């Protein structure tokens, strides 16, 4: 009695909890029902057994989850773990991470596919393939837009009330690929997955359930055949077969409309509720519309997948309705694991796959509590036709099984699984009770629905249109009907599936891929163009015939539909009778279920109590399982680390092998070079020995001839001596008398001569005292160009004299000597040159005591600088605006590069930016500086290979921008003692990387110009020069220059600037074709309509900006600060070399873009950049002064014995070459300015000494490049300039002109070298008879006349040369042409001049 009371009390507590918690408590999957506590918040508590949870987790791992299902599983799993573990140990699974990773995986696959298609099209160079890809992408864009409209329509449909909501909705969302890709070899777990919309019996208004994971439909699988069989089986109970397809649309809509009910459980909201047969209202829709809808649904992914071994609970496919089919209690066991609650008026449930829940089901079967009753889909149709509900079978078998279980099982032997089974049985009983009540209501509604359907069918009119869409819809609808009505046997389906599965397991992946249908590139676009071709249009007769055929088919279809309508009415009447009978059976069934529930309650309580005992034992099993999972994950991580280590070691081995191979190749090359050197040395020794032998023989012959001549001369001398003695003896007497008479006159003249001699000695002493150097005023020797500490002035000519060179040049000048002779005369005769020089030094050359003009000049210079800076700001603003337009234009272009180091360069560029951005404003730490140097070193090693692709890849990755950020550290320095944030060594490395990026890379140099990065380099260069070279008056320019300016940073900036401008010169686009220059922006065309192409505009702005910022003055100060040789100072030599190279590049670019004609001798000279004026004001930026000091200030010369040094080191030679190239480029830019500057007093003397010394060096040491530059420069100096022609033939012998005539014989025989020498000789001697006489002493002038005549007669030389396009740069060989070194209009006169014989 007490036991009965306790059970009764327990039963009352359970009932009270059930009454308070609702249907959520009845759906619990737990070990026990907590009797003492419950949640106050009203939320459900759901406890799940260990095996059940593990089954759910296994199912989640073995199935591909959609994003919507992920959210549902998260909420369900969280609820389960809330009761299994303590609150402190609760760990929520991060399903959102899985969803994000799955989404990233999809987009990664999409990106890879697009990249592969792009690479294929690019490699094939096929426009057809590109068009086909564009066509497919447009179609996919349309599909996704249609999907957006579909989702919006679904949301709108949910918000509408039930009365105004349509009964069905067919929507074609995805037209491009209605079926998913067929998985070639799916695993067993992936095949046995539940259907897309899993259904379960709903015993309440909103039951909290967990949606089962689902796979996307995989084409036409075995589950599709089951679906086809199911629809074919149920077709007999339907009114028309065509109504079996529209519910698929509802299933499609249900996947995307999910929400949570009032109790916090996630539910799937259908597109519209699936109403029962008695409550759903059928609209008045034509049969043609239903057929079209069935066709649309057949193309979508709305096919429900059914597991091969799951129990078919009963799914009645009709026009938006479903039949209620109760199943055996055993069938609900697994439905509690993964149920899917559907917010509908009527629900059914299906089971999970047998293989997915095999562990639970095997446990259930071992206990032998309940035997499973499988209801095939054929039974559903039989029950519907016979009117026998399946619940009768359940009611007959359940009491017998229950009694057998009660007799066989003892309460002490009940296992944990048995308690779970009994709990689920009670839950199923409650659900069946609810389902029975709903089924009764559904039967009543079904009856009413059938009545309305009969009335609607009787009032429905048949309306068949004959257009193409209706005909296509009808044809597709009939095909869908035939498919849905097809009959298939379940055994056939299983046999076919097993055959296909065995074939998949025995076939390799490659064979499966090869059996995929091939898709030739371009086939799609070809077929699209072929099908859309205008030639496929029908003629009027064909269209009329086609229309008549459609009319006939439509008439036949109308008759067919009328017959189907009659048949449908008959079936509806029969079904109405069946439904009424079914309603009566359901009422009887409800009574039997109540009796069965009372019998089962007592047994269930006993089982539930036994289950509590086993709960603790399962905890250890769960802990072991978690430990096993953690161990497995650790092993997987270890395996990944080992595989990465193996790949790393393999890569190191490959690099070592490559390094060893390169070392061997280098050693082989060195050995080959040494072998060639030994062979050349042996040949040279042989030639030397041969020459020595010949020289000895020649000396022996000469010595023998000399001895013979000497003997004959001695004999003749003795004979002449005897004759002379005899004649002298005869004349001695007569001469003695004459000598005595003349002795007095001679004595008088001798005294006068001694007096004049003493005066001359006194004058020379005075002159020596006047000269600071104490050197004789003979211009045959090179005087010093060092500025005087106190400047001198010629009071007669009012000329300022700054150095000894200017003094000698002025005193020897024609104007000064003429002025002295006009102002002074001695005894009516003209003064000699020595007298004029002596008088000038003694009387007219005076020291300047106070330089009164200095303040005024300084003020004027300051105002000029301010004006230039304002102009430079305007130019920079214009350049920045154009740079922004260029960058916006280049953003649309994808600069691709096939560099093998592209990824590495991108990473290194990002590292540079990161290191600069992370660092604060203070000085960098040593570790950060080391990291920066390592990064720059890696970039340097890659770019030193001089691969253009690597250079472009580094620029595209933002490398130049990162280098600019690094170099910004120089800007804050305002004086020499300022400590930089980044060490100078690192800055020099950055400059070196910048240089390597732009060296011989026209693309990068063009980008530096057009993106205005060149302005940053120039500003940085001017800033460095400003720090080390203070602003000075022109009179003392260069005296206060800090020697630190010649260090590496400033030199690197000069080198980079020269490299960029030089590359722009070498790769400058022509006027007709400009591949490297982007199209000129519209705004720029409006601002400067008269200007040339963008390249010319940008270069003009750049040169104008540099000139106005004072770069020329700063460089001039640096050049003037050099007062000695650079042999022992290589840093200074490199600085001077790159500075002269920068000036050379600026002159060459200015010549190319100023827009004047190609001829150098054109008088229409316009230089809007101001470069010519700046160089003219600074005497060629002091380069000639620097070169003179480098060449001559390193020697101590004795006026009587010493001669200038003519052997120079390589550093000096390179400085001389760059300086002469600058002279020649400036001469090409503005020849009169060059001749006037170099031909002025002082510089003309320095130029003559410099040219003579360099020619002497080239005569001793072979240096062709230097010799050619000197020859060309002398030609530009003397062409059409009589005063300069006199300079080259003056001085000590051999003069400059004589040295040109004494060049090796190859310069008079080799056509290539003749082209170099002869134009300079013609320029130096034309219309100068004295120079021509000197020339004729060394060579024949006929050679020059013949040279001119040959060039004049050469086809194309005389005619085409003057008509070169404007703005073209002089090439490496163009400046050697005669037309560019001597005016063409004077060729004939020059030829006549050199053919004319001079009178001796």
Curated annotation (Swiss-Prot):
Residue ranges for the region (Disordered) are: 36-61, 226-277, 517-550, 701-723
Annotated keywords: Disease variant, Endoplasmic reticulum, Intellectual disability, Metal-binding, Nucleus, Phosphoprotein, Retinitis pigmentosa, Zinc, Zinc-finger
An example of a Gene Ontology cellular component annotation for this protein is:
ooplasm
Q: How is it modified after translation?
A: Phosphorylated in vitro by the CCNA2/CDK2 complex.
State where the protein is found: Endoplasmic reticulum; Nucleus
What's an example of a GO molecular-function annotation for this chain?
nucleic acid binding
- Composition skew (Polar residues), residue ranges: 231-243
- Post-translational modification Phosphoserine, affected residues: 832
Q: Which residues cross the membrane?
A: none
On subunit structure and binding partners, the annotation says: Interacts with CCNA2/CDK2 complex, but not with CCNA2/CDC2, CCNB1/CDC2 or CCNE1/CDK2 complexes, at multiple phases of the cell cycle, including S and G2/M.
Linked pathology is: Intellectual developmental disorder and retinitis pigmentosa: An autosomal recessive disease characterized by mild to moderate intellectual disability, retinitis pigmentosa, and attention deficit-hyperactivity disorder observed in some patients.
Q: What is this protein called?
A: S phase cyclin A-associated protein in the endoplasmic reticulum
Q: Which organism is it from?
A: Homo sapiens
